[in-house]
Amino acid sequence: SIYLGYRQLNRINDIGQSFFISESQFDSWINRWKEINGFEKMLPFPREESTASLISTEITAYSFDRVVVCDNAAIAQMLIANNFHFENSCAVLSITGYPESIFTTVLEMLRRNPDLKVYALHDASPSGVALVYNLRNSPDWFFNTNAVIYDLGLLPRQILSSQGVFVINSAESSQQAQQLPEEVRRDLTSEELKWLDMGNFVELESFSPQRIIRVANQGIAKIQAPDSSDSLILIDSGADSVYVVESFG
């Protein structure tokens, strides 16, 4: 992942920042890189595949114990390209339906597991902080199941307590924040709500793949022994089990 216009800031991250370079300049660098290195080590944009892949019935008869669900296809694609799913014996999907060719089949396999653990990996954005809520309450995902959901994503409070994070601001994000379900908003502090309502957000893609993978690995490892880690927080102890792992910061 190439981090555009990154700059270190020694102040609270409540003001949106601008890129130092133009899109055309960035494209020229990428084209030059391709001329020298080829396409081998660059991930293309996640593409939509209208045709589902055929999976052996011997495989579909089984299920996964764990799944990482990302709030965008690019992060899911990066994890898969780096064999994260093999190393952690888990499925990797995006809330947007990536990878399309096997998405429906894998989701059906997951729903058959009564002991499924779900790890949500997301941006510090309105759609990101709503990811766990959507996974829990959408009939397209894990509504009315026993799946336990863990939040491994970026949270606004982690951004507010950090320095040198690239904060983006948009009117659209502000509008989305103010339209978040009440159940999502009440799990956020007043400072977090103010930050989101101002239109601020931080993308996971602004961090290196190495760091994202490390955080996800560490989060999953901590969850294996939650009693030994004070960074694992139960935020809703009703019929739904949702945990937050304080990983970024």
Task: Annotate each predicted stretch with a short phrase.
Residues 1-116, 132-249:
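Nucleic-acid enzyme cleavage-core boundary/entry regions
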Residues 127-131:
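Extracytoplasmic/secreted cell-surface and envelope-processing proteins
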